[in-house]
Design a protein with these regions (language model features):
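Alpha/beta-hydrolase fold nucleophile elbow
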Residues: 139-151
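Short alpha-helix in the alpha/beta-hydrolase fold that links the catalytic acid
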Residues: 93, 201, 210, 224-233
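Hydrolase active-site cap/lid region
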Residues: 154-210
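Catalytic histidine neighborhood in serine/cysteine hydrolases
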Residues: 229-250
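Short beta-strand/loop motif that positions the catalytic acidic residue
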Residues: 207-209, 214-220
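Post-His helix in hydrolase/transferase enzymes
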Residues: 252-267
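An N-terminal hydrophobic leader/cap segment in hydrolases
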Residues: 9-55
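Membrane-embedded segments
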Residues: 57-134, 150, 154-155, 161
Length: 272
């Protein structure tokens, strides 16, 4: 192979690589936020929850589900879902978690579940803060709120919980940062300089002062288990974990998990 041909091949490969970088850079948010995917269990609600709409700072109405516990408790579970699918995909969790003496608010992000808007990191933070404001208008304060973050929702949870006295946090399949997650899925790309939405949970978790329960499947191939372990390691006490030998991204809601959840709820009651 002569020198000029070698140079041509190198230039062609470089051009293809740059095209890939350009494509991923311009499409990154459509790769990260996938509201159209419906890949989790659908289950009908077995509790008398109502559909509500929570208005964010852009006046976008976020379709949400609110369950008011008959005990009239102020304790409220606020749920932030992950990057894929509608809120209906999480009804099976609400059904299980309604066993506790708490209200439940499950919100959907902008552009998800039929909502208007375009998702961004700052946008999701705004949606989350709007949900907290909605609860506060119902005389439910931060100290009454347990925040549940699922996958991408864990990063929103950690951001919102910083230096705030929430009743507790539940993190399902948390990741250290979107940079680390992107490196795992796209190891051949310079994601550190490409990413618009970085979600730096590993830098923020030290600022969380609420009790934390972290659950993660050891065989998770979307968010590697080591990331959940790292977040647990960095978290302040009191903290507890449920690391289970499963190969799914989200953990199975079985008796073992619910037993650990029972212990966490006992912890946050006693922590007061």
């Amino acid at each position: 192979m002569n020198y000029s041909l070698t140079i041509k091949i190198i230039l062609i490969l470089l051009f293809i690589y740059l095209l890939i970088i350009f494509y991923v850079y311009t499409k990154q948010r459509s790769l990260l936020y996938v509201p159209q995917i419906d890949n989790y269990d659908d289950e009908l609600l077995i509790i008398p929850a109502e559909k509500v709409f929570i208005e964010n700072s852009l006046n976008i109405k976020l379709r949400s589900i609110f369950y008011k516990h008959p005990s009239n408790t102020k304790t409220t579970l606020l749920m932030f879902h992950g990057n894929a699918g509608p809120i209906e995909n999480r009804f099976y969790k609400i059904n299980k978690l309604s066993k506790y003496d708490q209200n439940i608010l499950l919100i959907s992000w902008r552009s998800y579940s039929g909502n208007d808007g375009e998702p961004t990191e700052d946008g999701l933070y705004d949606d989350a803060r709007s949900a907290i404001k909605w609860l506060e208008e119902k005389n439910i304060s931060k100290k009454d709120i347990i925040i549940y973050g699922e996958s991408l929702g864990t990063a929103v949870t950690i951001e919102i919980a910083q230096n705030n006295n929430f009743k507790g946090l539940i993190l399902e399949a948390p990741f250290t940062s979107m940079i680390d997650a992107a490196k795992f899925h796209y190891p051949y790309l310079p994601v550190s300089i490409m990413l618009k939405d970085k979600y730096l949970s590993d830098k923020k978790i030290k600022n969380v002062i609420s009790p934390i329960f972290i659950m993660h499947a050891i065989g998770d191939d979307i968010v590697p288990f080591r990331m959940g372990e790292k977040i647990y390691e960095l978290a302040n006490s009191p903290k507890s974990s449920y690391f289970v030998d499963e190969n799914e991204h989200l953990v199975t809601y079985d008796e073992n998990l619910m037993n650990m959840m029972d212990e966490f709820y006992e912890t946050i009651i006693n922590y007061e």
